[in-house]
């Protein structure tokens, strides 16, 4: 089920991590590095890489490769000096980050890193559309 993420990240994860560490996303990988709940993105790519529900988000988080990478790249975001997600990701992808961090904050409530990203970049606010889709 999660193979689509592993396949996509195989070629792009190192570049994505390097871009985040530099503080500026310059290539196209947001969908499969910071996935969102199904129902937000309308493109075929967004739909393909969407997470269907909280259970799949928990599986992603618990996966030995995907979960570790998500925590690592989220930690890289926390180590940046600034707190403007638009400066790092641009307008649209900064919204995708907020929804992804909201999803994983709910899927892994015992791991503070996702809420810490929300605290730093979004004043602690979670994404309202993600919450609505999840019925929270």
For the regions a language model picked out, list residue spans one by one:
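Short helix-to-loop capping/linker segments positioned immediately adjacent to catalytic or ligand/cofactor-binding
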Residues: 17-23, 84-89
């Amino acid at each position: 089920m999660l193979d689509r993420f592993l396949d996509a990240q195989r070629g792009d994860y190192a570049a994505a991590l390097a871009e985040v560490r530099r503080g500026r996303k310059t290539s196209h990988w947001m969908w499969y590095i910071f996935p969102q709940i199904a129902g937000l993105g309308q493109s075929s790519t967004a739909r393909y890489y969407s997470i269907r529900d909280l259970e799949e988000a928990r599986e992603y988080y618990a996966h030995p490769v995907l979960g570790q990478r998500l925590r690592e790249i989220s930690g890289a975001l926390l180590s940046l000096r600034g707190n403007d997600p638009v400066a790092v990701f641009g307008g649209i992808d900064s919204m995708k980050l907020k929804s992804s961090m909201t999803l994983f904050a709910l899927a892994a409530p015992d791991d503070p890193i996702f809420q810490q990203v929300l605290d730093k970049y979004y004043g602690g606010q979670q994404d309202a559309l993600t919450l609505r889709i999840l019925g929270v």
